[in-house]
């Protein structure tokens, strides 16, 4: 991984549900470790559970909510 790429650490606070054509993506609500008052919804590929720490390469993008 390139040391010049800024990354943001975020903690999974709630698993919202599965999405994707085959359910291979999990929608989660994350809280930023640097700014705990800020939370966003992201899509995560692979296994994930509450209290996991995610490394976000891009922290401004928010996922659309499940219907």
From Swiss-Prot:
GO term, biological process aspect, one: maturation of SSU-rRNA
Coiled-coil region list: none
GO molecular function, one term: structural constituent of ribosome
Highest taxon above the source species: Eukaryota
UniProtKB keywords: Acetylation, Cytoplasm, Ribonucleoprotein, Ribosomal protein
Function: Component of the ribosome, a large ribonucleoprotein complex responsible for the synthesis of proteins in the cell. The small ribosomal subunit (SSU) binds messenger RNAs (mRNAs) and translates the encoded message by selecting cognate aminoacyl-transfer RNA (tRNA) molecules. The large subunit (LSU) contains the ribosomal catalytic site termed the peptidyl transferase center (PTC), which catalyzes the formation of peptide bonds, thereby polymerizing the amino acids delivered by tRNAs into a polypeptide chain.
Subunit: Component of the small ribosomal subunit (SSU). Mature yeast ribosomes consist of a small (40S) and a large (60S) subunit. The 40S small subunit contains 1 molecule of ribosomal RNA (18S rRNA) and 33 different proteins (encoded by 57 genes). The large 60S subunit contains 3 rRNA molecules (25S, 5.8S and 5S rRNA) and 46 different proteins (encoded by 81 genes).
Family: Belongs to the eukaryotic ribosomal protein eS28 family.
HAMAP family per record: Ribosomal_eS28
Name of this chain's protein: Small ribosomal subunit protein eS28A
Top-level taxonomy: Eukaryota, Fungi, Dikarya, Ascomycota, Saccharomycotina
Chain's gene name: RPS28A
């Amino acid at each position: 991984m390139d040391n010049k790429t800024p990354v943001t650490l975020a903690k999974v606070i709630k698993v919202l549900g599965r999405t994707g054509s085959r359910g291979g993506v999990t929608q989660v609500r994350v809280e930023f470790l640097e700014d705990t008052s800020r939370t966003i919804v992201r899509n995560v590929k692979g296994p994930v559970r509450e209290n996991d720490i995610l490394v976000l390469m891009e922290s401004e993008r928010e996922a659309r909510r499940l219907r």
